[in-house]
Amino acid sequence: MKRKIRKGVFETNSSSVHSLVVSNEGRESSKFKLNKDGEIEIDFGQFGKDERIYSSQYDKLSYLITCLYYLSGYDISDIYDKWEFEQIQDAVCKYTGATGIKILGKQEPEIDHQSQPYGDIEIINVYDEDAVINFVFNKYVSLKTDCD
């Protein structure tokens, strides 16, 4: 029997189980500049129907914040009260040493590639600190938008 050992890969012998494993080896240090209060300043993004790949830390965090805008009833002040925002902010601040995330709200938010209504941030598990950190800071993780 031939055996193949892959580091950092979870594998089962079941053909009906599929896993996605992201190695922590791709984590980069933060590229965010902190404001005078030690906060990361982020604005909403425009994530349309065009086919595009977003790889920068700023774009990936902006995507999460833009998702929260839609989950919060289209109100910036309500985002700060969302449990999901607290989870994302805690993970990002722990990783970067920032004191918080400040949403600028200068740009009009847009997510136009998703055909399902928003009920949750399904792109990552915000309960899992490592998932948040890997999504934002791992150079091997990108966000691809497209239209179905």
Language model features with spans:
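Long alpha-helical, hydrophobic tracts
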Residues: 1-2, 32
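Short, extreme N-terminal segment that most often corresponds to the first beta-strand
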Residues: 2-26, 147-148
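Short non-domain terminal segments
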Residues: 8, 30, 42-45, 83, ...
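Intrinsically disordered, low-complexity segments enriched in Ser/Pro/Gly/Ala and basic residues
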Residues: 13-15, 28, 54-55, 71
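Prokaryotic Sec-type signal peptides and long signal-anchor helices
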Residues: 14, 36, 139-141
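A structural detector for beta-sheet-dominated domains
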Residues: 22-23, 35, 43-45, 104, ...
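Charged, amphipathic alpha-helical linkers/stalks
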Residues: 29-51
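Low-complexity intrinsically disordered segments
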Residues: 48-142
